[in-house]
Amino acid sequence: MARYRGPRLRITRRLGDLPGLTRKAAKRSYPPGQHGQARRKRSEYAIRLEEKQKLRFNYGVSERQLVRYVKKARAQEGSTGTNLLKLLENRLDNVCFRLGFGPTVPGARQLVNHGHVTVNGRVTDIASYQCKPGDVVAIRERKCSKQLAEGNLEFPGLANVPTHLELDKAKLSAKVTGRCEREWVALEINELLVVEYYSRKV
C-alpha cells in the first residue's frame, strides 16, 4: 500500500488524534461517510487493524515498511511492541518532527528529502535513516534551510522534546542520546494489538 496523500482529517475522524499526521483537530468525532454515525460492534480483527493503521498513518510508513519494522522488532531483545515504537520514533523524519524542525512528520520528511538536514555533518536525504545514540542531527548551514526550521520551531507540533534528544535551538542541532522511552511516544496506541495483527501474517 502506497503512502497516503489524501485528506488528513478524514483519517483522524476515523482513527482519532494522530499528532504526526496533522495538527488540526477533526470537528466531528464520528467516522466519515454515509454510515459514519451508525454504531456497530467491531470484531477483534477490526480493532487490531485500526491500531495498525494508526501506526502507519502517524509515522507515514507504507505497509511494506511497517512489516519490515515488525520483523526487526521481533529480532531484538525485549518487548516486540515497544521495540517497534522505538524503531519508528528513531526514524530521521520523526526525529526532526519531535525536535520541532517540521510541523508534522510529512513536513519533516519534506525537509529531509529536500536536503535541509545533516547527520554528523553530512547531508542526509533518507527519511527512514535510523538515528543512533551519538548521532548529531542538524539543519544545514544555508539561509533557506535555517529559515524553514526556525519558522517551524516557533510553533512546534508537540510541546516537549523527548529526553533522548538534546536540542540546541541556537545551533538548530540536536544530539541523539539513546532510543525513545515508551512514555515519550505521543501517539495513543496499543502496540500489542499491532503485534497481534501481524502475528499470523509475518
Swiss-Prot record:
GO process annotations (BP): ribosomal small subunit biogenesis; translation
InterPro entries (UniProt xref): Ribosomal_uS4, Ribosomal_uS4_bac-type, Ribosomal_uS4_CS, Ribosomal_uS4_N, S4_RNA-bd, S4_RNA-bd_sf
Keywords on record: Ribonucleoprotein, Ribosomal protein, RNA-binding, rRNA-binding
SMART domains per UniProt: Ribosomal_S4, S4
Organism superkingdom: Bacteria
Coiled-coil segments: none
A GO CC term assigned to this protein in UniProt: small ribosomal subunit
PANTHER family the UniProt entry points to: 30S 40S RIBOSOMAL PROTEIN, SMALL RIBOSOMAL SUBUNIT PROTEIN US4M
Family per similarity comment: Belongs to the universal ribosomal protein uS4 family.
Role noted for this protein: One of the primary rRNA binding proteins, it binds directly to 16S rRNA where it nucleates assembly of the body of the 30S subunit. With S5 and S12 plays an important role in translational accuracy.
Name by which UniProt lists this protein: Small ribosomal subunit protein uS4
Protein's organism: Parasynechococcus marenigrum (strain WH8102)
Gene coding for it: rpsD
